Amino acid sequence: MVVRYIDVETLKHETPMLAVGVFEGTETLSGWLEIIDRALGGVILRVLSSGDFRGKSGEELVLYGPENTGLKRLLLIGLGQPDKFDSESVRRAAGRAVRVAERMRLGSLSISLDAFSNFDAASTAQAAAEGAVLAAWKFRELKTDKSTGTSDVTTL
């Protein structure tokens, strides 16, 4: 697995799936999530206001991106309550993103760290990388089918 950090405009980044964290109780969007929502025609706000996705820990929802961007799929990951959020929550969210990418048989995944801007950038990036690597690890030594899962994780 290759894990790398890049600083790029989200909508111009070519990726099979971009994972974005959403806190529970989110009613307004900011940062990249607001920009992505505008590109998707407001679907993220509609999903949040309808209650179909609440941002609770463990929740996930895949949306499909517009044709004119490099964003093929958008994965909303529920982060739970902001006051209970810590580095372990980042690990779990990144791990869930990797498992969804593997379930969809995607070869790579990008994880946006924009939702974590109130936290230390270095420790957040490290926790996301740890969660992704731990979720992707599988014991394959004694297995005859050594197929690989998600092999490339990019954090934005």
Predicted regions span which residues?
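Short amphipathic alpha-helical segment within the helicase RecA-like ATPase core
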Residues: 1-156
